[in-house]
């Protein structure tokens, strides 16, 4: 049986690996790691048969690792030969989310200033992240709610399946 290394239990890449395994008609045992960094040595060392990480550029530096696909809408610029999971026939688009919130009832002008400040900061961060192989998406307002709703929809089913399996034990 396949063993799939990922970052932590119930992290975005752990849940995405479970979704991908289900979509591919298989499964495999999830092997949590303390971060993305330990995944490549685990894969190269044969401790796992596959790895799901936020950025696999480090793995590309060895001829023993090949990136099979990405969970983005479009191919990752820094990994142009790696197809998206959608290109491979799996409706899997996902990733990690970082959000900033303010208390309900916060003055709309303050919200606007915060959004502007984070937008400018994000431009700086996004370029560095792109160089590291990450795909950055910036969303505010309704777009952010839509993004969170999509993530909830993606993960809800797999989390319910995990809960049902735990009840059976």
Regions found by a protein language model. Give the residues of each.
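Conserved, function-defining micro-sites of small-solute handling proteins
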Residues: 1-169
């Amino acid at each position: 049986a396949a063993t799939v290394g990922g970052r932590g239990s119930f992290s975005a890449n752990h849940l995405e690996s479970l979704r991908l395994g289900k979509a591919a008609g298989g499964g495999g045992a999830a092997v949590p790691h303390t971060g993305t960094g330990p995944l490549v040595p685990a894969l190269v060392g044969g401790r796992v048969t596959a790895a799901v990480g936020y950025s696999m550029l480090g793995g590309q530096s060895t001829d023993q690792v090949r990136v099979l696909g990405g969970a983005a809408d479009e191919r990752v610029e820094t990994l142009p030969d790696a197809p998206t999971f959608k290109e491979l026939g799996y409706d899997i688009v996902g990733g990690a989310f970082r959000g900033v919130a303010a208390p309900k009832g916060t003055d709309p002008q303050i919200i606007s200033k915060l959004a502007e400040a984070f937008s400018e900061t994000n431009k700086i961060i996004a370029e560095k992240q792109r160089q590291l192989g990450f795909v950055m998406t910036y969303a505010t307002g309704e777009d952010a709610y839509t993004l969170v709703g999509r993530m909830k929809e993606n993960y809800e089913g797999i989390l319910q399946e995990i809960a049902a399996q735990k009840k059976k034990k």
